[in-house]
Amino acid sequence: VGTADYLKKLAEDNGCTVEVTDLEGTFRAGGSKRYQRWVQQLLGLDTSDPVAWRPDGRMEVMVADSPEQMQRFIRERGQEGLTARITAGFCWPWSNPDGNRLVDDVGIGGWSMPWNVKPEQSVPDAPKSDLWSTDRRGVEQVGCVYTAQTFEYDWNGVIIGPDLLFRNGKFRVDRTASRDPAFPGPVDDDIVDRCIRNAYHVLLTRGVIGTIVYAVDPATHNELRRLIPGTIGMQHYDGAQPKLTAEGSQLPPAYSRRDG
C-alpha cells in the first residue's frame, strides 16, 4: 500500500490516465546532485575523500571569515525578501529564556546570538520553533539540527563547531565538544560520530540558493578555504553602503546589481 505501482493500478482501475514523472532532483541545494554528493564526501559519509567544490550553476557555496560576516550577509538576504537563516552544530548550551529574552548562548569571540526558541516555550519578539524558518524574525536566532531538519530556506549559513575538526585530510568528530543532550555518557563513540556527521549533513543541505560556512576551529576553517573557492567579500554599489557579496563565484540574481 502506498507504492507507486499500487497507486498507478488503483488510478487506472478507476478510469484515470496515469503519467509517471521521475523526480531527479530536490528543491534543496537548487536540485544540485553535485552539491549533495560533495557534502557527503566532505563529511565522510561515503567512502570517498573530501574534494574541492566545483560550481555547477545550481548551488552557491562560500566561506565566511567570521560569524559577524556571515550574520551580515544573511541579514542582507533577508532584507531582499529572501529566506535566510544561520544554523550551528550543537556545541553550545541551550538555555531557558532569561525572563522575556533569549540568552545569547552561541558565542564565538566577541560575537554571540541566541538559539531559536525551544519547542515547548514562547518568547516575545521571537518565532516559535516550528515557525523559525519561515517567520522573518527567525533571522535573529541560530537554528539547531532539531529545528532545521525538514525545513529549507533560500540562503543557509552553517557554523561548524569544535565537535567537527578537519585533520589529516578528513573530518574527525570530537564528542567532548558536543553539548547535545542526546549523547549521554554510555552512548558508543561510533554512534556519536555518525550522529554528529549526519547532523551537519542536515544543516548543510537546507539551502535552496546557497550555503555559507564558517568553522570555529582555525585549522578547519583554513581547510574549508582550500576546498571552497568562493568567499564573502565587500563590494560597493553606486556609492551606497557596501554590501556583502560573493568573491570567487558567480553572483546569483538574488543579489546581482540592478540598474535604475
Describe every region a protein language model picked out.
Residues 253-254:
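Intrinsically disordered, low-complexity segments enriched in serine/proline and basic residues
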Residues 11, 43-46, 207, 211:
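Conserved NTP-handling cores and scaffolds of large molecular machines
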Residues 136-241, 245:
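C-terminal accessory regions
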Residues 1-9, 37-42, 98-116, 172-176, ...:
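Short secondary-structure boundary/capping segments
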Residues 19-21, 25-35, 43-152, 156-164:
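Conserved helicase/translocase motor-coupling segment
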Residues 1-27:
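ASCE P-loop NTPase helicase motor core
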